[in-house]
Every structure is written in C-alpha cells, then in structure tokens.
C-alpha cells in the first residue's frame, strides 16, 4: 500500500495523509473529501501534473487543485504565515474599503459554525481575492461589520449611536452569527416605542380630567382602566364605549349620561353611583355590585341597559324608574327593594332573580323569563296586562 501527503495548491501547511488505491479518480475523490474542495487535478512538488496513478510513489507530496494553475508554495506571494499556528495568526480584512485587523481565533472560536469561521478556520481553503496589501476582500458594509467583529472579540453587543440595528442584524444573518442575531432582535424590540397596554391609574386619569374643560367630552373609548380606583370622581358625559373597566372601583362616582356601551364592567363596584341617563347597551357587568345606585333622572332621561349582561349583579335598593332593561340578562341577579316603576323588562332573562320588595308598577315584563324569580313582599301587585309568563 502506498501513502501520500496531500496539500492544497500553494500551501505547505495542514496536509492530509491518505492511502493510494484504485484509479486517479478515486484519489481525487479522497482529496475532495479530506480537503473540503472539489479536486480536479494533482501536481507533484515540482509542478508536474499527475495524470496516471502509476506515477505516484510512496510518501510523495502532492498538491491538489480545483482547476487553477499550479502555485509553488515556496514562492507564494501571500503574506507569510505566523509562527504560533493558525489560531493566533493575524490577518487583515478589507470590508467595503475599510481595513480591520484581527486574528483567526477571533473569527473562528466564538461562532465555529458561522460563515467567517468556515472562511478562515483552515488556511488556503478559502480562495477569496486579496488586495495589494494582502487583505481579504469582503463586499459588505464596514459600519455594520464593526459591531459584529467586536462581538466576536468580547461577546458583548455594542453599537455606536447613529448605526441602524437593522443593518447590523442583516449582516449578522449574512455571516451566520446566530447568538448575535438573538441579541440584536431583543435590542431592536427594546428600542421600539413600547406598546403600553397597562391599565390607566387614578393619578393619570385625574390628570386628564383636570386638563379637560367641563364642557368638553372626554374620549376614553377602548381604554384600559382595569382595576383602577375611580371612586367619587365626576365622570359625567365621558365616552367609555368599549372600555375595559373590569374590577374598577366606581363607588359614589358621577356617571350621569356617560356612554358605557359594550364596556366591560365585570366585577366592578358601582355602589351609590349616579347613573342617570347612562348608556350601557350590550355592556358586560357580570358579577358587578350596583347597590343603591340612582338611574332615575328628574328630567325624564331614561337609562338604557338594553341587551346588557347583568348576571349575578347586586342592584339592591337602586332607583331604576323607567330604566330600559329590554332583552338584558339578569340571571341570578339581586334586585331586592328596587324601584322599577315603568321599567322596560320585555324579553329580559330574570331566571332566579330576586325581585322581593320591588316596585314593578307599570313595568313591562312581556316575554320575560321569570323562571325561579322571587316576587315576595311586592309593593304593588303585578297586573295581567304586564304579561308575565
């Protein structure tokens, strides 16, 4: 069995010892696998082309090419090799016309699977062009490359002012610096204006109220007040349409003529609140407390809670003369001792609702569901014309 030492064309370093068998094509296949190239021809140390396997002797030194002419390793015009091995070799990169000097270990060790590591981990493997100073030419943006090189040096992402992080991210993706990509994506996300969905506090809202003239309508549509303490505030005529007021404390608040259409009031406390002329169409007040509230407007303006979800609400002792609760859901609600004179309860779900002690004079209960409802101690008897079924 014969064995030979294979080198890349023009390089006397990092050779591979292989066994010679079969044909010249077999040797080229082995050379391609060992050296990571597409070998097409083999030369001896004197530049002679080997075209027959029989010409190869034991312990020959051969140079493998990818089709380029033979380069004598002793007269190679490339900069001289370092004396301490390739992991400490200094090299210069010409990136977009700007020079960067670093070591192979910097480019290889931090991200061994990156493009830069594959380009420089073995000398001579990468056949890129070099300029007149021997610097490797890389056609990329130097201002975006500098943060990447510094990251490979010390592992910290440092980007100077005025440099777009998106540009650095694209360069990191190009060179395959995976760990840096994660850092950059986080940095870009943190640099964006925050999408603040946190609830508005009482202090912030009071500041809005003080800055708004009393005759101007404050627009709070769709805002998040979840859990806020808005008790005892003057909230007249404010547009809370589709706002999140869940678990809010609105006790003793003045919500006269406020628009709470489709608002979320679930779990909120509105005890003793002034709700004259309030608009609460299709609002969700499930589990809320509305004890001793006043819905009755002396001017005749009626509160509108049509289609509202009032499951399990506690409205005990509230004044609701003329209120519109058409097709609302009051299942398991507590309406003890409420004044519901002239109220519209047509199509309302009153299943298991406690209406004991209520005044339902002239109230419209046509088509309402009163299954399991409690009508004890009524102030006025229900008339057949009210059509309870």
UniProtKB/Swiss-Prot annotation:
Q: Which Gene3D superfamilies match?
A: E3 ubiquitin-protein ligase SopA (2.160.20.80), Potassium Channel Kv1.1, Chain A (3.30.710.10)
The family database entries (PROSITE patterns) matched by this protein are listed as: BTB, KHA
State any single GO MF term. Answer: identical protein binding
- Describe the location of the Pentapeptide repeat domain by residue ranges: 224-256, 258-297, 338-376
Note the InterPro entries from the entry. 5peptide_repeat, BTB/POZ_dom, Doublecortin_dom_sf, KHA_dom, Pentapeptide-BTB/POZ_domain, SKP1/BTB/POZ_sf, T1-type_BTB
Organism domain of life:
Eukaryota
Q: Which residues form the KHA domain?
A: 3-82
Which keywords does this Swiss-Prot/TrEMBL entry list?
Answer: Phosphoprotein, Repeat, Ubl conjugation pathway
* Pathway as given in its UniProt record: Protein modification; protein ubiquitination
| Positions of the BTB domain | 89-161
| Gene Ontology terms describing biological process | intracellular signal transduction; protein homooligomerization; protein ubiquitination
- List residues modified as Phosphoserine: 11
Say what the protein does.
Substrate-specific adapter of a BCR (BTB-CUL3-RBX1) E3 ubiquitin-protein ligase complex, which mediates the ubiquitination of target proteins, leading to their degradation by the proteasome.
Give the multimer and partner information. Forms pentamers. Component of a complex composed of 5 subunits of KCTD9 and 5 CUL3.
Name of this chain's protein: BTB/POZ domain-containing protein KCTD9
């Amino acid at each position: 069995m014969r064995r030979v030492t294979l080198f890349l064309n023009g390089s006397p370093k990092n050779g591979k010892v292989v066994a010679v068998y079969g044909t010249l094509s077999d040797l080229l296949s082995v050379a391609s696998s060992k050296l990571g190239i597409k070998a097409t021809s083999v030369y001896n140390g004197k530049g002679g082309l080997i075209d027959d396997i029989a010409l190869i002797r034991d312990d020959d030194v051969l140079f493998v090419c990818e089709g380029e002419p033979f380069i004598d390793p002793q007269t190679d015009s490339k900069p001289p090799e370092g004396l301490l091995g390739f992991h400490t070799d200094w090299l210069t990169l010409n990136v977009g016309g700007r020079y960067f000097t670093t070591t192979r270990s910097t480019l290889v060790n931090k991200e061994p699977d990156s493009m830069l590591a594959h380009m420089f981990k073995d000398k001579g493997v990468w056949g890129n062009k070099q300029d007149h100073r021997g610097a490797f030419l890389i056609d990329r943006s130097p201002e975006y490359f500098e943060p990447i090189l510094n990251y490979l040096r010390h592992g910290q992402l440092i980007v100077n002012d005025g440099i777009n992080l998106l540009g650095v991210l694209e360069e990191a993706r190009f060179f395959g610096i995976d760990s840096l990509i994660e850092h950059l994506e986080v940095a870009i996300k943190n640099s964006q204006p925050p999408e603040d969905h946190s609830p508005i506090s009482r202090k912030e809202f009071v500041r809005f109220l003080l800055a708004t003239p009393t005759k101007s309508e404050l627009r709070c549509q769709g805002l998040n007040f979840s859990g806020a303490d808005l008790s005892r505030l003057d909230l007249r005529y404010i547009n809370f349409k589709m706002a999140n007021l869940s678990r809010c404390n609105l006790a003793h608040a003045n919500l006269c003529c406020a628009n709470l259409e489709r608002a979320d009031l679930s779990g909120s406390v509105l005890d003793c609140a002034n709700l004259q002329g309030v608009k609460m169409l299709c609002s969700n007040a499930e589990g809320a407390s509305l004890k001793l509230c006043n819905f009755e407007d002396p001017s005749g303006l009626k509160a509108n809670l049509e289609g509202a979800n009032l499951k399990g609400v506690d409205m005990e002792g509230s004044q609701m003369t003329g209120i519109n609760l058409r097709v609302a859901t009051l299942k398991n609600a507590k309406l003890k001792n409420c004044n519901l004179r002239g109220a519209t309860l047509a199509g309302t779900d009153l299943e298991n609702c406690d209406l004991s002690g209520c005044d339902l004079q002239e109230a419209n209960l046509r088509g309402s569901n009163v299954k399991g409802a409690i009508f004890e101690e009524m102030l006025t008897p229900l008339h057949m014309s009210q059509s309870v079924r």
